[in-house]
C-alpha cells in the first residue's frame, strides 16, 4: 500500500496557500518560486510507485568499496534511454560519513558514460544537467555561452546562471541529455530503504547523509508531468576496470579512420575501441597524473568522420576524453611524444619543436626548443634530475633544464630513442648500437655489444617510439631489431654483467609473425614482456604474446581481425610514491647541510631515479633556506631557531610531501681562537673550505690537535 505520509510531508514543506498561484519550494535544497502546478507534478512523480523497486543484488555497475551500500537512480524525460530509469550502486565504509554529493560524484567519476553539469552555490551542490553516453564513444563536450568545455571526472563545473544556455554537444545517437528550461528541472528524491516509496527531498544532495541500503534518485520534471518513476528499471552492466591490464594504442588505418585504443584485462579479455576518434595515426601514449596523454600525428584522418586531436587527454579511471588539442604550437607540427615534468607541466615533441603543455589548463603554454634542421622529429624524451634529455630523431640529443626551459647542451649523435634503467642511468639507441649517457660530462659513451648483436631498429622515416625499453625489476634494457619495418628480433642487455644476448627470434616463426612498429614493452610491476605480432603482411591478423623475463611464452591473446596497426603498449599507473622518514636536520648559522634524497622515495611502478624532488615550502625562511638540485637537498642555516622544510616527491605526475624538521644553532661567538681543553689549534678554514692563517670575520672552522673540529664565528 502506498504510504500517505509522503503526501502529507510534501504538503507541509510547501510554502503555499491553497488558492495561491505561485509557491516557493526547495529544488535540490535551493528555494525557488514556481507555479503551484509544478509543485503538484513533483508529488505525482513520487507517488507513481509504492516502493523504489530496486534490488541491490541486481546492481552491477558500482563505484567505491566498503560494507555499506546505496543505490542511484536517474530518469531522463522525453523517452530518452527508452524511458527507463538507470540504476547504479555506491559503496563506502561504515566508519565514514557520506553524503548524497559523495555518491553522485563517485558514480559519475567511475562511469565513463555518465556525466553531469553542476555547481556549488549558497545552498550546496546543485545539479543542472545529467547526460548519458549511450553509444559509448566517450566523446562529450558542453557548449556554454562563451566556450566548448570538457568534463573533469565526468563533471562540467559551471555557474548555475549558465545552466539554461548550455547544451551537451558532440554526442551520438541514443545519448541522453536534460537541462533546466523554464520550470523543467532535475528533482531530487530519496528513500531510506529500497522497499520504501521515494520522497521528494527538501534538502540538497550536500546535506543528505547516506544510510546503508538507501536510495537517491533524480528525475527530470516536464511541463505535462508525464515523466514519473514507474518501476521500469535498467541495471547497467559492470564497467571495465582499467587498472589491472594493459592498453594498446593503435595507429588506425591511414586514410580510413582515426586512431583508437584497445584494452587487455588481466584475465585476457579484450575491450575494443574503448577510446576512439583520437586523431590520425596514434603514435605515443603515457600515464601521468591520473590521466593518459595520447599523441597523434594529426588531428583528423582523411577518412574519419570526426576531428580528434594531436593531443588527447583521457581520465585514467574511465578513459573518458577530457580534452583534445588539435594544433600544437604556432607552426602546427605533427604530434610525436610526451614527457611529464611535474604535476603541472609536460613537454610534447612534434615535427617542429618541443612545446610546454600546461597540465592544469590543458593547453600549450610555451615553445621550449626549435632547430634550423629540416625534416626534424622530436621523439622520445626522459627526465632525470633537473634535466630532460630529448632525442631529435636520428640527429641530436638535447639537454634541457626544466626549471626555465633552457637548452643546456646539444650532443651530436644519431639518437633515435632513450630510456632509463633501474639503476637510474640513461641509454640511447643509435644507428650503430647502444650508448650510455654520461650525465656528468653530458656525453654519449658507446657500449660494446659483442658479435651477433644487432643495432636497434628505427622507424626509417615513419616515426614511432621504437622498441627500446627497460625493466623496473631488473637492471636490464631491451630493444627490437630488424632489417625492415617489421621487427623480427628482441635483444637483451644485462647492465650489471655488461652482457648482451638474443632473447626472442621471429625469423623462423611458423606463422611468419613479426612485431609491428614499437609494440614491444615491459610491464613495470610483473616484469612480463608484451609483444604484438602481426601475421605476414596481412596487417589484420594480430596476436599479443606475453613472455616471462627469460623469454618463456606465458600466454597468447588474439585480437579481432581488423586493420589495427598496433603502435605501443601503455601500462596503468596504479601506485603512488611512498616516502620514508627523513632524519631531522641540524645546522649552524651559515652552514649548509646536504641530504641525498635519491633513495628516500619509491614507487612500485616507476624508476626511483625518475621521481622528481623539489622544495614545496620552508616554514620560516628567516631561520633556514632550502633547495633541491639533481636530487640533493641543501639546507642552509640563516639564524638560530627551528623551522620545517616540506619536500615534494612527484612520480608519474602524482605528488606526495614529507616534512623535515630543521634546527639552526648559533655557533660559539668569539673574537679570537678558543681551544679545547688540553688541545691546540692546528688548522683554520674559511666557510668556503679555503685555508686561512689567522681569524677572519664570519664563520671559521678550526681543527685541534686532539682531532676535534669546531665552528666559530669571529666578529
What are these model-predicted stretches?
Residues 21-240:
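Ubiquitin-like/PB1-type beta-grasp interaction modules and other compact soluble beta-rich domains
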Residues 255-262, 302-312, 353-356, 395-399, ...:
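Structural motif
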Residues 665-715:
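C-terminal outer-membrane/trafficking sorting elements
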Amino acid at each position: 500500500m502506498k504510504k500517505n505520509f509522503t503526501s502529507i510531508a510534501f504538503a507541509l514543506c510547501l510554502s503555499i496557500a491553497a488558492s495561491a498561484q505561485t509557491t516557493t519550494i526547495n529544488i535540490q535544497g535551493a528555494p525557488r518560486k514556481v507555479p503551484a502546478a509544478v509543485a503538484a507534478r513533483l508529488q505525482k512523480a513520487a507517488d507513481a510507485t509504492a516502493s523504489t523497486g530496486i534490488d541491490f543484488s541486481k546492481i552491477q555497475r558500482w563505484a567505491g568499496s566498503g560494507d555499506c551500500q546505496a543505490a542511484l537512480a536517474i530518469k531522463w524525460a522525453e523517452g530518452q534511454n527508452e524511458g527507463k530509469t538507470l540504476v547504479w550502486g555506491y559503496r563506502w565504509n561504515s566508519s565514514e560519513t557520506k553524503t548524497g554529493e559523495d555518491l553522485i560524484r563517485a558514480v559519475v567519476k567511475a562511469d565513463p558514460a555518465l556525466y553531469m553539469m553542476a555547481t556549488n552555490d549558497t545552498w550546496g551542490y546543485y545539479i543542472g544537467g545529467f547526460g548519458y553516453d549511450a553509444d559509448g564513444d566517450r566523446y562529450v563536450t558542453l557548449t556554454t555561452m562563451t566556450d566548448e568545455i570538457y568534463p573533469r571526472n565526468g563533471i562540467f563545473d559551471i555557474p548555475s546562471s549558465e545552466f539554461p544556455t548550455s547544451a551537451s554537444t558532440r554526442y551520438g545517437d541514443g545519448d541522453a541529455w536534460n537541462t533546466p528550461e523554464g520550470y523543467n528541472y532535475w528533482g531530487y528524491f530519496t528513500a531510506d530503504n529500497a522497499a520504501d516509496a521515494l520522497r521528494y527531498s527538501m534538502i540538497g544532495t550536500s546535506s543528505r547523509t547516506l544510510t546503508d541500503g538507501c536510495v537517491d534518485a533524480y528525475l527530470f520534471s516536464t511541463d505535462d508531468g508525464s515523466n514519473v518513476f514507474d518501476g521500469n528499471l535498467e541495471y547497467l552492466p559492470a564497467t571495465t576496470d582499467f587498472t589491472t591490464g594493459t592498453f594498446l594504442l593503435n595507429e588506425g588505418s591511414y586514410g580510413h579512420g582515426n586512431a583508437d585504443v584497445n584494452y587487455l584485462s588481466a584475465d585476457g579479455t579484450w575491450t575494443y575501441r574503448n577510446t576512439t576518434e583520437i586523431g590520425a595515426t596514434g603514435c605515443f601514449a603515457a600515464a601521468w597524473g591520473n590521466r593518459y596523454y595520447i599523441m597523434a600525428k594529426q588531428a583528423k584522418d582523411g577518412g574519419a568522420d570526426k576531428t580528434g586531436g594531436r593531443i588527447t587527454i583521457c581520465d585514467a579511471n574511465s578513459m573518458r576524453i577530457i580534452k583534445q588539442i588539435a594544433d600544437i604550437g604556432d607552426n602546427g607540427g605533427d604530434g610525436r611524444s610526451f614527457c611529464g615534468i611535474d604535476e603541472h607541466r609536460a613537454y610534447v615533441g612534434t615535427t617542429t619543436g618541443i612545446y610546454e603543455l600546461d597540465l592544469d589548463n590543458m593547453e600549450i603554454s610555451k615553445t621550449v626548443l626549435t632547430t634550423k634542421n629540416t625534416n626534424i622529429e622530436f621523439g622520445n624524451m626522459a627526465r632525470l634530475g633537473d634535466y630532460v634529455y630529448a632525442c631529435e630523431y636520428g640527429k641530436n640529443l638535447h639537454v634541457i633544464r626544466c626549471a626555465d626551459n633552457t637548452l643546456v647542451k646539444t650532443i651530436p649523435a644519431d639518437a633515435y630513442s632513450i630510456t632509463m634503467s633501474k639503476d637510474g642511468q640513461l641509454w640511447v639507441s643509435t644507428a650503430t648500437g647502444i650508448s650510455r649517457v654520461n650525465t656528468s660530462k653530458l656525453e654519449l659513451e658507446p657500449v660494446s655489444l659483442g658479435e651477433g648483436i644487432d643495432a636497434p631498429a628505427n622507424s626509417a622515416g615513419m616515426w614511432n617510439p621504437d622498441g627500446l625499453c627497460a625493466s623496473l625489476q631488473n637492471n636490464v634494457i631491451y630493444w627490437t631489431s630488424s632489417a625492415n619495418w617489421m621487427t623480427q628480433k628482441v635483444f637483451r642487455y644485462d647492465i650489471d654483467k655488461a652482457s648482451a644476448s638474443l632473447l626472442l627470434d621471429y625469423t623462423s616463426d611458423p606463422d611468419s609473425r613479426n612485431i609491428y612498429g614499437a609494440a614491444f614493452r615491459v610491464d613495470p610491476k610483473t616484469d612480463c614482456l608484451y609483444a604484438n605480432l602481426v601475421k605476414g603482411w596481412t596487417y589484420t591478423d594480430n596476436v599479443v604474446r606475453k613472455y616471462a623475463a627469460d623469454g618463456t611464452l606465458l600466454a597468447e591473446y588474439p585480437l579481432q581481425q581488423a586493420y589495427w596497426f598496433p603502435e605501443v603498449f601503455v601500462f596503468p599507473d596504479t601506485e603512488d610514491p611512498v616516502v620514508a622518514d627523513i632524519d631531522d636536520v641540524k645546522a649552524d648559522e651559515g652552514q649548509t647541510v646536504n641530504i641525498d634524497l635519491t633513495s628516500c622515495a619509491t614507487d612500485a611502478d616507476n624508476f626511483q631515479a625518475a621521481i622528481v624532488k623539489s622544495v614545496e615550502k620552508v616554514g620560516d625562511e628567516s631561520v633556514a633556506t632550502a633547495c633541491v638540485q639533481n636530487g640533493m637537498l641543501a639546507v642552509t642555516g640563516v639564524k638560530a631557531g627551528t623551522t620545517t622544510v616540506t619536500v615534494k616527491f612527484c612520480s608519474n605526475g602524482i605528488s606526495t610531501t614529507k616534512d623535515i624538521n630543521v634546527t639552526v644553532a648559533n655557533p660559539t661567538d668569539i673574537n679570537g681562537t678558543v681551544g679545547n681543553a688540553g688541545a691546540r689549534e692546528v688548522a683554520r678554514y674559511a666557510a668556503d673550505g679555503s685555508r686561512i692563517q689567522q681569524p677572519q670575520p664570519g664563520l671559521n672552522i678550526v681543527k685541534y690537535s686532539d682531532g676535534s673540529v669546531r665552528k666559530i664565528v669571529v666578529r
